[in-house]
């Protein structure tokens, strides 16, 4: 797995997330990476290497989690983990994290970044959302900037219905794309609740990231925390 990291020219980005410094090894030139796409692999499933970029939606998710979510001891599933920032921050705050991605190279970088930040309680699993091989329900399901292709909406909702624990919460972060709206309509159609807020982010520019919290009709962990 580490060979996936060594084959690329990389840089390290250091982020301040709440009270912690998080180091993320990333691809030095994302645009150059596109030139080396395998045309056969792309033709099979239009597999662009989105995992290789550190997206603002992931940075906003990391900040949100660190400030808002009671993570210690919780079971966390990350969908489309990419470079692993979100999973690393969750683990640093005491969560037990399963990072999943469709790309082996993404999991290699996520594993590398977990080691770089001395994270424990992190596991990594190659996973196709259409055929999820999961064995438990999770307190939190987290996904950053994955809502852009309609063909994935049904499989993602199925994962939420099957693997989000009662009383648990899913959080999806994205830059406010219009084509994400039907996904959240589908979420509500299947009986889940969804609330949206916008998170201001100053990182490589100014952003307003949409954060969508999804839960079963029962109260969410944040509701319980506020009632204490």
Go through each PLM region and give its residues.
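S-adenosylmethionine-dependent methyltransferases
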Residues: 1-228
């Amino acid at each position: 797995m580490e060979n996936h990291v060594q084959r690329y020219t990389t840089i390290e980005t250091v982020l301040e997330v709440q009270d912690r410094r998080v180091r993320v090894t990333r691809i030095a030139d994302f645009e150059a990476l596109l030139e080396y796409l395998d045309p056969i692999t792309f033709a099979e499933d239009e597999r662009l290497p989105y995992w290789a970029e550190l997206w603002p939606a992931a940075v906003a998710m990391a900040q949100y989690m660190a400030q808002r979510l009671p993570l210690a001891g919780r079971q966390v599933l990350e969908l489309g983990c990419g470079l692993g920032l979100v999973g690393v921050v969750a683990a640093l705050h005491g969560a037990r994290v399963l990072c999943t991605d469709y790309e082996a190279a993404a999991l290699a970088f996520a594993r590398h970044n977990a080691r770089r930040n001395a994270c424990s309680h992190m596991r990594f699993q190659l996973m196709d959302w259409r055929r999820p091989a999961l064995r438990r329900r999770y307190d939190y399901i987290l996904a950053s900037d994955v809502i852009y292709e309609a063909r994935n909406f049904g499989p993602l909702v199925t994962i939420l219905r099957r693997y989000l624990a009662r009383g648990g919460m899913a959080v999806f972060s994205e830059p406010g794309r219009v084509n994400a709206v039907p996904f959240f309509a589908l979420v509500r159609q299947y009986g889940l609740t969804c609330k949206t807020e916008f998170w201001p982010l100053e990182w490589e520019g100014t952003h307003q990231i949409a954060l969508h919290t999804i839960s079963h009709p029962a109260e969410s962990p944040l509701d319980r925390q506020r009632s204490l």
